[in-house]
Amino acid sequence: MIKVWIDTDVGGDIDDALALLLAMSSKQLEIVGVSTVYENTLARARIAKTLLALGGKGDVPVYVGESTPLRATYVHTIPLDINRLPKTYEEDVFGNAVVEYNAVEALHKALNTYQEINHNVYT
């Protein structure tokens, strides 16, 4: 099995949710962790954890990542609002994100733990 880490802004457009669902259903991939980025990363982490739980992968840890770019300047014309919820979700999400580590620390730990983890970047 190929070990993968998924860094996502799930909760915006449907693409990240579909990618997460496809990864969960793959017999060739093992998701070792998920981190969230962009704006309200805690809400995104809860959405990711909910999707994982619904897909029978509730044991996969989800980490809250950075709300703003670490190095680059924010270039979108709409002001960045780290408190804005991703899209509008009427239903309650029941997932819980891991907050003992930040996403960068968690990914670093995973890369050291799983030497064979796929660390390619896809956008």
Which stretches of residues belong to each language-model region?
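N-terminal acidic, glycine/proline-rich low-complexity segments
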Residues: 1-123
